[in-house]
């Protein structure tokens, strides 16, 4: 076989030209201590705050402390097999989670990995978890309503798209139930819902998911769960992962609703993390930046202006109080960050007023401008009437001989309280709420005993659906009560009153 020197030269030249010397440079560090979900690593001098690190066994971590001779990192996963002396690699990426349509209907953990056995997330894109909230110029004032389907909220503490409304109360007062009802009521409202469970029992989260499935709400809901058995770093990151998923829809001109259940446990997880990282403790042993922890999370809920698509992200954070104490550290922080609060009271809950909303202490600072005009018309005097009723009821305990006007006001107030009660998982469309509140406010139920008002309400809805569907339709379309519509409402309520037997 005859090989020519020219051919050999040509082959060598070609190989030299095509030679691509790829060198993968990665910065490695060594674990000097590990425990309680925290690792201290030596040798990562160029690590960034919030950067992802790769630990042995495909576990990821997040840089939280940058110190002179080491970095403190939170391990976002199982720590049992990670030991002192192991190597850790920088990724050069800030913590990211998957976002997009692929997440709807799924249950994921605090870093967006599916935990519902439904397979991998197809077609999801990654987004950084820690990003800046929209500024003032990019926002628009809240003007569209979020209907929760609960009479007491939609009438007295209305919520608008882009608002942050705190749900606060002791344990077992119906905080989660209220948020779940709000999610169920978003069916057909073009709203994506995100439920973030922080430090909850896995059995409780499974019950919530089951309830959402029963009511067809998982078709538009994402559940992010960082359970009580998960390490503190995962509980800390979960709300940020949830809000990042919500921002994807907000930034694409859609509307999203996010529930954080609850931020008290989130603050406790962050306190644990901070103390393990040896950050100096402050009031109640919380670190100094615990206010910023929640403010930077809740400021990301916003109503964007029309140039940016007009999307919105509405937040319903939940806070658990101890014995009704609103003045402790975390409750006061979150009250000052949010645009209003719904205060649930244990005494009301146990006396049968459910949802157990204390109307006097609950307020919506920006929701009034988003409330449906018809609801504003019928519920305008409702708060005042309930306040007067409570004052008179307290006064009437001391005296038995009350004049007729006082007795009438007490009777009306008791009926208003009764009408605002509502069973769980039965949210109502706003037009039905308007009609029943109109009936109670204008004396149509004054002559009935309190015990029959629940039946009155149910039969009224049935009567309206079967005989006066056009009235409900007109109310839903017009969203305001004019003279003609009011005359029709009066006629319908009078006709129903004639056939109703207490």
From Swiss-Prot:
User: Recorded E.C. number(s)?
Assistant: 7.1.2.2
Q: Which family does it belong to?
A: Belongs to the ATPase alpha/beta chains family.
* Origin species: Syntrophotalea carbinolica (strain DSM 2380 / NBRC 103641 / GraBd1)
Output the superkingdom of the source species. Answer: Bacteria
Protein name, please?
ATP synthase subunit alpha 1/3
Location relative to the cell:
Cell inner membrane
Q: Which gene encodes it?
A: atpA1
Instruction: Print the keywords alphabetically.
Output: ATP synthesis, ATP-binding, Cell inner membrane, Cell membrane, CF(1), Hydrogen ion transport, Ion transport, Membrane, Nucleotide-binding, Translocase, Transport
Q: What residues form the membrane-spanning segments?
A: none
Q: What's the short name of a Pfam family annotated to this entry? A: ATP-synt_ab_C
> What positions does the entry give for ATP binding?
169-176
Q: How does it assemble?
A: F-type ATPases have 2 components, CF(1) - the catalytic core - and CF(0) - the membrane proton channel. CF(1) has five subunits: alpha(3), beta(3), gamma(1), delta(1), epsilon(1). CF(0) has three main subunits: a(1), b(2) and c(9-12). The alpha and beta chains form an alternating ring which encloses part of the gamma chain. CF(1) is attached to CF(0) by a central stalk formed by the gamma and epsilon chains, while a peripheral stalk is formed by the delta and b chains.
Question: Does the record carry DNA damage as a key word?
Answer: no
What role does this protein play? Produces ATP from ADP in the presence of a proton gradient across the membrane. The alpha chain is a regulatory subunit.
Its Gene Ontology molecular function terms?
ADP binding; ATP binding; proton-transporting ATP synthase activity, rotational mechanism
**Catalytic reaction(s) noted:** ATP + H2O + 4 H(+)(in) = ADP + phosphate + 5 H(+)(out)
Q: Name one GO cellular component term.
A: plasma membrane
EC primary class: translocase
Q: What is the lineage of its organism?
A: Bacteria, Pseudomonadati, Thermodesulfobacteriota, Desulfuromonadia, Desulfuromonadales
- Site, Required for activity: residue positions: 362
């Amino acid at each position: 076989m005859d090989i020519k020197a020219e051919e050999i030269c040509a082959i060598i030249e070609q190989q030299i030209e095509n030679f691509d010397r790829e060198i993968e440079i990665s910065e490695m560090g060594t674990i000097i201590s590990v425990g309680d979900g925290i690792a201290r690593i030596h040798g990562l001098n160029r690590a960034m705050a919030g950067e992802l690190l790769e630990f042995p066994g495909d576990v990821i971590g997040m840089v939280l402390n940058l110190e002179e001779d080491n970095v403190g990192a939170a391990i976002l996963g199982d720590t049992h097999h990670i030991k002192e002396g192991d190597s850790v690699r920088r990724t050069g990426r800030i913590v990211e989670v998957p976002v997009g349509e692929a997440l709807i209907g799924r249950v994921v953990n605090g870093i967006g990995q599916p935990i519902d056995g439904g397979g991998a997330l197809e077609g999801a894109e990654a987004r950084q978890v820690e990003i800046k909230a929209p500024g003032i110029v990019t926002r628009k004032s809240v003007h569209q309503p979020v209907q929760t389907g609960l009479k007491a909220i939609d009438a007295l503490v209305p919520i608008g798209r882009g608002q942050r409304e705190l749900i606060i109360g002791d344990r077992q007062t119906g905080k989660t139930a209220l948020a779940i009802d709000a999610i169920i009521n978003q069916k057909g409202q073009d709203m994506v819902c995100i439920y973030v469970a922080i430090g909850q029992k896995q059995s409780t989260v499974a019950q919530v998911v089951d309830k959402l499935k029963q009511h067809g709400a998982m078709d538009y809901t994402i559940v992010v769960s960082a359970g009580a058995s998960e390490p503190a770093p995962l509980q800390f990151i979960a709300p940020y992962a949830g809000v990042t998923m919500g921002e994807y829809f907000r930034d694409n001109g859609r509307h999203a609703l996010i529930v954080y259940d609850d931020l008290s446990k989130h603050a406790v997880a962050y306190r644990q993390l901070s103390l393990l990282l040896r950050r100096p403790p402050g009031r109640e042993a919380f670190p100094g930046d615990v206010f910023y922890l929640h403010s930077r999370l809740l400021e990301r809920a916003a109503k964007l202006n029309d140039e940016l698509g007009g999307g919105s992200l509405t937040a319903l954070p939940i806070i658990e109080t101890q014995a009704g104490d609103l003045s402790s550290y975390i409750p006061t922080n979150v009250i000052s960050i949010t645009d209003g609060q719904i205060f649930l009271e244990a005494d009301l809950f146990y006396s049968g007023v459910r949802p157990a909303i204390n109307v006097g202490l609950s307020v919506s600072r920006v929701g009034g401008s988003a409330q449906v005009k018809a609801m504003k018309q019928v519920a305008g005097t409702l708060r005042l009437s309930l306040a007067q009723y409570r004052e008179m009821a307290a006064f009437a305990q001391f005296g038995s001989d009350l004049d007729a006007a006082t007795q009438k006001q007490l009777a009306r107030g008791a009926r208003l309280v009764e009408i605002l009660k509502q069973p769980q998982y039965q949210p109502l469309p706003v037009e039905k709420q308007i009609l029943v509140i109109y009936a109670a406010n204008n004396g149509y139920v004054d002559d009935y005993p309190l015990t029959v008002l629940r039946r009155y309400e149910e039969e009224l809805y049935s009567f309206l659906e079967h005989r006066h569907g056009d009235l409900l339709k007109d109310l839903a379309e017009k969203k305001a009560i004019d003279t003609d519509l009011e005359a029709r409402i009066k006629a319908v309520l009078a006709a129903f009153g004639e056939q109703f037997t207490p």
